[in-house]
């Protein structure tokens, strides 16, 4: 359609609007943004080499706008409608996460951009969990939860109308896009009034706190919004100075010269006043703040090594002990870009330097990039990990549901049921990273 707005522009508008809304709802989130911005600035000022690398890799511009949100929905219909909503913003479901292995009765995916240009512009992602009613053991309670969920609609009538219009027209003009952002935002807004009485809330809460959070409110309120930092250890140590109490452990890999995957921490969930049906006042605890530090994406071989080491490491009682033990355990994981490339542990994006451009005819498909890197013709840039770690996600969920101890089991994965609810298969993160690396090699003449 003429004068249509791009998905990237809509995603940018939406992520900015959501950030502004969450800042109003959870003032500590604003404090967190300031702290992260200060730490990032200090890191870049003290490390000109990192600054230059991030500029060259198109990573710097996205740093200050980078966020991920997390939501939880109750029905297949809600999940499928969210898929249509996020598609308008150029966000697609990547990976399947089974959180039942940590005793959390949900399974999840991450809606995010998938092409290089969209990620460089604004890599906004939303970790989206679907409640698994079949994991509620009490049959009466399970039926009650299903009945409550059947009666709600988390989307405004106008939002549903706009979804139809977009799918019929194949796009939005500027006015429609702005209206869509405002209507979509309502789905994620916090509602103080619960849809159930206190007795029902307590019964669901006693079964699992997360079930009460999903079932008892009129929307799928955003339960955290996460900025990206370049030094999560520094942020963790400074949070108490800003009046923010961090969770005990930083989740994920240890601090390294070459960061890998994802490290996360958070502040404790807020106790918020709610009104139950019948105007009875009570409290609900679900929403919190989170910070993340992202590193290089790992190949299946690298991920296997990471998972094995993390399993062997276990968890410490406090963050200092935990991090020291992690560092000791992870000594066997190479900590240089060269070794990680050489051993096929991580994904990289290859670019020709001006000198490489001048010698393009001397570069052939199948050439080993390493001699070309040493000659100064090619640079290899780590591809940022854009996804999530199930164990870390579960750790964050548990600590903010009042439980710092991490219980892990084999879980009860049901990817097929999740994809059926979603209405499409989830994308394979490894395939996306491999394609990104191969695209870059092709541009250099290496493939």
From Swiss-Prot:
Coiled coil: none
GO molecular-function terms, A-Z: dioxygenase activity; metal ion binding
Metal-binding among keywords: yes
Site (Important for substrate specificity): 72
Sequence positions that bind Fe(2+): 68, 224, 290
Known catalytic reactions: 2-oxoadipate + O2 = (R)-2-hydroxyglutarate + CO2
Cofactor: Fe(2+)
Enzyme Commission number(s): 1.13.11.93
Record-listed 2-oxoadipate binding positions: 68, 72, 224, 391
Keywords: Dioxygenase, Iron, Metal-binding, Oxidoreductase
Function: Catalyzes the decarboxylation and hydroxylation of 2-oxoadipate (2OA) to form D-2-hydroxyglutarate (D-2-HGA).
Protein family according to the UniProt entry: Belongs to the 2-oxoadipate dioxygenase/decarboxylase family.
Record's protein name: 2-oxoadipate dioxygenase/decarboxylase
Gene that encodes it: ydcJ
